[in-house]
């Protein structure tokens, strides 16, 4: 039982960004020692800043913010630091250094037992029993496996950004601070690892603040939502679904200008309330409704959609046909004998651990890499659209609005005229943000510009690589609605189970041992099928295995 009523306090806290934008305005909050809190707000509302203040990193604020005496704070930033002089396992073991010191001292005394040290040994044994430290190495192994950490002896310098985050998260969870601050913890995790993390955090013996766009995660872990809105911190008791209902009521009272946001919120709430069977039926119905989607896309007239996608030419019966495709990387076989046929209107969710081969598959489908065996064929009318991640694709001297709109006040999406500033605003570039130079944008902001440009170009098969990573919940919700109404196909790499459940008609799953499963249905239905095929243990995340490949 914590010795304090609240683990953290804020009194009259204010934070202003350079240039004068007030991001936190006279915030008064206190956090219970076992509270699980999801932090929501549009990009730029101060979510990461709030965590940095609570972690003691950002001290440039007025008012008061302090942690309870004796409480430790652990913080996972979006780009965590590791000790480059240590291996992966040595970095993880830093999180249990204090626990290991207790075991080491006990073992040292046991090796040199004497009456003088008997009392200390007895006290240490009680502490080891109470903290369940006898199997500490096994606990570390389990956490590293569940988070699919790189090999124990891997050098930190060679790790990707996603691998660094998994190592840092593993270290932090094993350390078990009284206040855990997590900034986008699900980024770079596959769907099954996210499900494991949910279970771990639900029973975590401390307070947690989570910044995430993953709505299932928010529903399954949190008991409170803290919404940052125009400088205010507004707490709601309940999970994401509860917040969604309360938010809808608040918007209805505030202004008729919020009509389009209310519509999108209502659609999402209706989807959440539907039974799993009804959700799965909806994903199948999309394939049969392709002609209706095409007709709607070509209508004139007003729309309340926040994001619209320009539709390309009508798709024929053949969209993408993959036959017997295999692909190796070095001596590892990533994909072994994959075949599938994508029907018109299909939306494919591509899932699997980092490094499994998802991006390689994407590159083959786009013709940027060739398979080692098998064929990939596109239908005659297919016009693919994808985000070019190279920096050269954007002009650093243009403003955000110029880059997205091409300098045109009106954009033509199908037969609809759309105000270009409104379109740009839908990707959460509002007001003065539209005048920012592209050259000063963050990586996430650049990706939103790329996405906005690509969606107005007129493709009929979209390729999206982790589109949810750089979007706040509001923009993500608008993108989902746009994709639901999109008269085309999409192939989407994502770990966001809510996104996959709501949109996917098919799943391509990298299941390990070089096998990629093609499944008709959404993510929820795929998980049920996987348990039937491979057993309940198949949903426990583990480091991926490959077949050996020899040419």
Please place each PLM-identified region on the residue numbering:
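Intracellular alpha-helical coupling/juxtamembrane segments of multi-pass membrane proteins
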Residues: 246-279, 283-287, 293-300
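ABC ATP-binding cassette signature C-motif
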Residues: 1-259, 303, 309-551
């Amino acid at each position: 039982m914590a010795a304090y009523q609240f683990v953290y306090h804020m009194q009259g806290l204010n934070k202003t960004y350079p240039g004068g934008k007030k991001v936190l305005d006279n915030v008064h909050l206190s956090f219970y020692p076992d509270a699980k809190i999801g932090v929501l707000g549009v990009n730029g509302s101060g979510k990461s800043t709030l965590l940095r203040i609570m972690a003691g990193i950002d001290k440039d604020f007025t008012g008061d913010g302090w942690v309870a005496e004796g409480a430790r704070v652990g913080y996972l930033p979006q780009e965590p630091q590791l000790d480059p002089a240590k291996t992966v396992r040595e970095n993880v073991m830093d999180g249990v250094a204090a626990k290991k010191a207790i075991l080491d001292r006990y073992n040292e005394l046991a090796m040199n037992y004497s009456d003088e040290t008997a009392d200390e040994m007895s006290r240490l044994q009680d502490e080891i029993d109470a903290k369940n430290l006898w199997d500490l190495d096994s606990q570390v192994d389990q956490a590293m496996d569940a988070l699919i950490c790189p090999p124990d002896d891997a050098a930190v310098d060679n790790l990707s950004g996603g691998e660094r985050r998994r190592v840092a998260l593993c270290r932090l969870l094993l350390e078990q601070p009284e206040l855990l601050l997590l900034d986008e913890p699900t980024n770079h995790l596959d769907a099954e690892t996210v499900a494991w993390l949910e279970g771990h955090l639900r029973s975590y013996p401390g307070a947690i603040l989570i910044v995430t766009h993953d709505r299932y995660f928010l529903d399954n872990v949190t008991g409170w939502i803290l919404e940052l809105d125009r400088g205010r911190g507004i707490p709601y008791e309940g999970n994401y679904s509860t917040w969604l209902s309360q938010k809808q009521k608040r918007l209805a009272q505030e202004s008729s200008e919020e009509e389009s946001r209310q519509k999108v919120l209502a659609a999402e709430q209706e989807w959440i309330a539907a039974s799993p069977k009804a959700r799965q039926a909806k994903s199948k119905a999309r394939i049969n409704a392709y002609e209706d989607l095409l007709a709607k896309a070509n209508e004139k007239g007003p729309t309340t959609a926040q994001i619209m996608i320009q539709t390309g030419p009508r798709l024929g019966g053949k969209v993408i046909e993959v036959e017997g495709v295999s692909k190796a990387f070095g001596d590892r076989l990533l994909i072994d004998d994959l075949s599938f046929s994508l029907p018109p209107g299909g939306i494919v969710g591509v899932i699997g651990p980092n490094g499994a081969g998802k991006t390689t598959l994407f590159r083959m489908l786009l013709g940027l890499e060739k398979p080692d065996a098998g064929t990939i064929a596109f239908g005659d009318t297919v016009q693919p659209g994808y985000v070019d991640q190279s920096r050269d694709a954007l002009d650093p001297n243009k403003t955000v609005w110029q880059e997205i709109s091409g300098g045109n006040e009106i954009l033509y999406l199908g037969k609809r005229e759309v105000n270009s500033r409104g379109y740009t605003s839908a990707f959460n570039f509002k007001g003065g943000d539209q005048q920012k130079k592209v050259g000063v944008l963050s990586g996430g902001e650049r990706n939103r510009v790329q996405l906005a440009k690509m969606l107005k170009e007129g493709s009929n098969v979209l390729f999206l690589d982790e589109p949810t990573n750089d979007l706040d919940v509001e923009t993500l919700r608008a993108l989902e609605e746009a994709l639901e109404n999109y008269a085309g196909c999409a192939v989407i790499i994502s770990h966001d189970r809510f996104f996959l459940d709501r949109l996917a008609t098919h799943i391509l799953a990298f299941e390990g041992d070089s096998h990629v499963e093609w499944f008709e249905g959404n993510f929820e239905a795929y998980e049920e099928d996987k348990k039937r095929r491979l057993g309940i243990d198949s949903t426990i995340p583990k480091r991926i295995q490959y077949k050996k490949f020899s040419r």
